[in-house]
């Protein structure tokens, strides 16, 4: 049995445990998380089915534009899609359509699509609607640090997956350059960059809904609104496969969080993090929205470390594990290693760049929030 097989069997075991707990009235707190996995099909369908169906159309538009430039530097066009899109928001579907080299396409959606893409299209736009305005500087600093370590996570994950280092390097050239540009923009023009990301996130969501509406009308009536779209069954099958994996991943994350609560709190103390910040890091392993919601209650150090870690580390035991295990289980272990490598190095850099505050300073911050 390979490591990837072991990961899938562990997910299956937690799925069964969650299902049993659901039948027994959520006695261990896993049944609710099991149900959450299948309930995720709705949001997944809204963001994915339209993009999956539109993938051939979008690829036909984008390939003539980006392919010559990427080919000139020896990179694959598929890495473009996952530099700006998460795997579950179009990155996976577009990588399949745009890839000239299947290995490069696989590398792109498994690693760039779980680190770089989610930060651009989801983390930054979504966070803006959650965090307090006074936390924008800490958020920008965390994103800046987190983006700088994305290439590290992709490199380590790619090597663990057995990809050629030359291919990895070529396909990380443009993402690394874009990371540097974004980092500079967040440093010098924070408010403008934040507005830009907000608009980009809205634009991607609109494209997804337009695609979903068009393929739904075509399925119901046979009337083709957008020629060249993939049939709706492909998107539905993809979301269903991911939901099955999530029904195991969510209970597993709940179990880890509960079982290792004390050791994780001890680790937080070593990093000079308060309890809220430590809990945020653990929560981000499954999903970072609860962490972002509690950002206002953290110290500045905790805020920066949490955001930096989330760029690569968020969803590693949640939807990204569910997606990769469902679509290409051979990549599951390497994806986990790569995302954690990117997240941990970002958190370490953030800890080094953001000094721990004195107890007196922390009391002052707590008083300002009470």
UniProtKB/Swiss-Prot annotation:
It is found in: Cell membrane. Disulfide bonds: none annotated. GO terms for cellular component: plasma membrane. Belongs to the EutH family. InterPro entries: EutH. Pfam families: EutH. It is a multi-pass membrane protein. The chain crosses the membrane at residues 6-26, 49-69, 79-99, 111-131, 143-163, 167-187, 206-226, 236-256, 307-327, 333-353. GO terms for molecular function: ethanolamine transmembrane transporter activity. Its main location: membrane. PANTHER family: ETHANOLAMINE PERMEASE EUTH-RELATED, ETHANOLAMINE UTILIZATION PROTEIN EUTH. Keywords: Cell membrane, Membrane, Transmembrane, Transmembrane helix, Transport. The keyword Transmembrane helix applies. This is Uncharacterized protein YxeR.
């Amino acid at each position: 049995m390979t490591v990837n097989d072991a990961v899938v069997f562990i997910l299956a075991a937690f799925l069964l445990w969650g299902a049993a707990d659901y039948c027994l009235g959520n006695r261990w707190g896993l049944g609710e998380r099991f149900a959450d996995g299948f309930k995720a099909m709705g949001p997944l369908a809204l963001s994915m089915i339209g993009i999956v169906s539109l993938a051939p159309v979008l690829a036909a538009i984008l390939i003539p534009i980006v392919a010559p430039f990427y080919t000139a530097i020896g990179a694959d066009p598929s890495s473009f899609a996952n530099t700006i899109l998460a795997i579950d928001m179009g990155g996976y579907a577009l990588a399949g359509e745009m890839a000239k080299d299947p290995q490069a396409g696989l590398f792109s959606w498994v690693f760039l699509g779980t680190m770089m893409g989610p930060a651009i299209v989801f983390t930054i736009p979504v966070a803006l609607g959650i965090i307090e305005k006074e936390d924008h500087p800490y958020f920008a600093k965390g994103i800046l640090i987190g983006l700088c370590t994305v290439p590290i996570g992709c490199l380590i994950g790619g090597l663990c997956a057995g990809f050629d280092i030359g291919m990895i390097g070529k396909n990380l050239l443009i993402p690394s350059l874009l990371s540097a540009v974004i980092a500079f923009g967040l440093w010098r023009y924070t408010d403008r960059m934040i507005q830009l990301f907000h608009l980009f996130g809205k634009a991607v969501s609109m494209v997804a809904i337009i695609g979903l509406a068009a393929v739904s009308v075509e399925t119901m009536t046979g009337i083709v609104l957008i020629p060249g779209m993939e049939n709706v069954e492909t998107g539905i099958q993809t979301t269903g496969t991911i939901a099955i994996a999530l029904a195991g991943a969510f209970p597993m994350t709940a179990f880890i969080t509960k079982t290792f609560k004390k050791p994780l709190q001890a680790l937080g103390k070593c990093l000079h993090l308060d309890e809220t910040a430590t809990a945020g890091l653990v929560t981000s392993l499954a999903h970072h929205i609860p962490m972002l919601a509690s950002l206002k209650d953290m110290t500045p150090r905790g805020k920066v470390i949490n955001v930096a870690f989330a760029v690569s580390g968020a969803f590693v035991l949640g939807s990204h594990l569910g997606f990769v295990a469902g679509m290409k289980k051979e990549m599951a272990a390497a994806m986990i290693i790569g995302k954690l490598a990117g997240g941990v190095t970002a958190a370490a850099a953030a800890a080094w760049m953001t000094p721990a505050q004195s107890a007196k300073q922390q009391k002052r911050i707590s008083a300002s929030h009470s």
